[in-house]
C-alpha cells in the first residue's frame, strides 16, 4: 500500500511541475524593440545608387568624391582576404572604364517570374544577432557592358556589401561577382 501511495504522490508531483507554464526567457530580449530607421536606409541606398550611376557615366571624380579617404574594399577575386583601399578601388573602376563602353546596372534579384528588390539591410535571423539598422547594405543586381576591343556584350550577376557613414561616404565595400566569367564571355567564339 505504501508503494502505491508513494507512486501516486510522485505522479502528482511530476504532473504538477511538468504542467507549470514556462516563464519567458531572457533570450526573448533579442526581439527588435525599436522601429527601423527607414530614412537612414533610404539615404544610404541613394548614395550607393549614385555611386553606381557615376560608374555607368565613367565619372571617376564623382566616384572618388563618394568614397571616404580611409575606405576599405574587398575585390571580387580572391586575394587572401586582404582589404584594399580607396585608390585600389578607383584603379579597378578606371580599368573597367578603359576596357568597356555602355556600362549599365540593372538593380534587383532576377527571379523566374519577376525581379525582386535590389537593396536589403538589417536581419531577423539569427536571433542573437538580429539587427534592424541600415549599417550594412546588401546589394543585388546585374552589370552589363560592351567590351571595347572585341565589341562583345558581357553581363555578370552582382552582389555587394556596402557601408555608408554619417557624411554620406562609402566606408566599406565588398564585391562578389564572377571575374573569370567576364573573361570567358569576351574570349568565347561566336
Regions found by a protein language model. Give the residues of each.
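C-terminal motif of bacterial Sec signal peptides marking the signal peptidase cleavage site
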Residues: 15-18
Amino acid at each position: 500500500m505504501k508503494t502505491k501511495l508513494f507512486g501516486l504522490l510522485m505522479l502528482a508531483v511530476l504532473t504538477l511541475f511538468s504542467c507549470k507554464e514556462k516563464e519567458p526567457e531572457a533570450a526573448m530580449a533579442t526581439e527588435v524593440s525599436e522601429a527601423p530607421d527607414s530614412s537612414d536606409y533610404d539615404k544610404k541606398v541613394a548614395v550607393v545608387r549614385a555611386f553606381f550611376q557615376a560608374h555607368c557615366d565613367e565619372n571617376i571624380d564623382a566616384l572618388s568624391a563618394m568614397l571616404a579617404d580611409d575606405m576599405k574594399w574587398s575585390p571580387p577575386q580572391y586575394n587572401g582576404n586582404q582589404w584594399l583601399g580607396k585608390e585600389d578601388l578607383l584603379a579597378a573602376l578606371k580599368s573597367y572604364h578603359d576596357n568597356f563602353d555602355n556600362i549599365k546596372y540593372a538593380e534587383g534579384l532576377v527571379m523566374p517570374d519577376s525581379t525582386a528588390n535590389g537593396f536589403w539591410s538589417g536581419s531577423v535571423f539569427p536571433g542573437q544577432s538580429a539587427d534592424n539598422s541600415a549599417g550594412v547594405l546588401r546589394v543585388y543586381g546585374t552589370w552589363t557592358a560592351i567590351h571595347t576591343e572585341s565589341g562583345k556584350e558581357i553581363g555578370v550577376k552582382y552582389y555587394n556589401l556596402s557601408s555608408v557613414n554619417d557624411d554620406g561616404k562609402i566606408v566599406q565595400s565588398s564585391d562578389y561577382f564572377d571575374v573569370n566569367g567576364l573573361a570567358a564571355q569576351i574570349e568565347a567564339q561566336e
